[in-house]
Amino acid sequence: MSRYRGPRFKKIRRLGALPGLTSKRPRSGSDLRNQSRSGKKSQYRIRLEEKQKLRFHYGLTERQLLRYVRIAGKAKGSTGQVLLQLLEMRLDNILFRLGMASTIPGARQLVNHRHILVNGRIVDIPSYRCKPRDIITTRDEQRSRALIQNYLDSPSHEELPKHLTFHPSQYKGLVNQIIDSKWVGLKINELLVVEYYSRQT
């Protein structure tokens, strides 16, 4: 299944706020109206919608998300918590959380077009897994910095999470540590996502 490129407002109207996909917000009460029209949700649908929220927020294909779930399942600790850490430490998401892009698709475009350096080297893989002490900067070129400055000049969409530090005058971000679950940028019940996939196998 390919990455979603359709109308973004349609998704947030059904699933709620997805800040990684769009800065727009669903109108208040739209979720309640949708729920009243559709009646009581089944447990399957509840788990499916949580999975879809995760997929659309981080801009993943179904295959990519399944791969992350499998990696998280083999790691020590809570599968759901590890899954969120893996997704939050992706380079495209780190750029978004630093405020260097207004959405995760926008951040992915910066990476694909080779505007971003990690520890002084160009990285053009949006799924690159960032680590503590990684330094994220832009190329020292006018066009690269102008693109980032456009995002920095726009109203900030959220507070900078504590696992990151950003120096706007230098266009430089620092990964201080692995993200704590309370700083994840999406309201999500990750256990329902894990349950969804466990019932598919």
From Swiss-Prot:
Top-rank taxon, per record: Eukaryota
Residue ranges constituting the S4 RNA-binding domain according to the UniProt record: 89-150
InterPro entries: Ribosomal_uS4 (IPR022801), Ribosomal_uS4_bac-type (IPR005709), Ribosomal_uS4_CS (IPR018079), Ribosomal_uS4_N (IPR001912), S4_RNA-bd (IPR002942), S4_RNA-bd_sf (IPR036986)
UniProt keywords, alphabetically: Chloroplast, Plastid, Ribonucleoprotein, Ribosomal protein, RNA-binding, rRNA-binding
GO cellular component: chloroplast; small ribosomal subunit
Region (Disordered): 15-44
BP terms from Gene Ontology: ribosomal small subunit biogenesis; translation
PROSITE patterns in the record: RIBOSOMAL_S4, S4
Main location: plastid
Cited Gene3D superfamilies: Ribosomal Protein S4 Delta 41, Chain A, domain 1 (1.10.1050.10), RNA-binding S4 domain (3.10.290.10)
Pfam families: Ribosomal_S4, S4
Family: Belongs to the universal ribosomal protein uS4 family.
HAMAP family xref list: Ribosomal_uS4_B
Quaternary structure, from the entry: Part of the 30S ribosomal subunit. Contacts protein S5. The interaction surface between S4 and S5 is involved in control of translational fidelity.
PANTHER family assigned to the protein according to its UniProt record, in alphabetical order: 30S 40S RIBOSOMAL PROTEIN, SMALL RIBOSOMAL SUBUNIT PROTEIN US4M
Name of the featured protein: Small ribosomal subunit protein uS4c
Organism name: Calycanthus floridus var. glaucus
Highest classification ranks of the organism: Eukaryota, Viridiplantae, Streptophyta, Embryophyta, Tracheophyta
Gene behind this protein: rps4
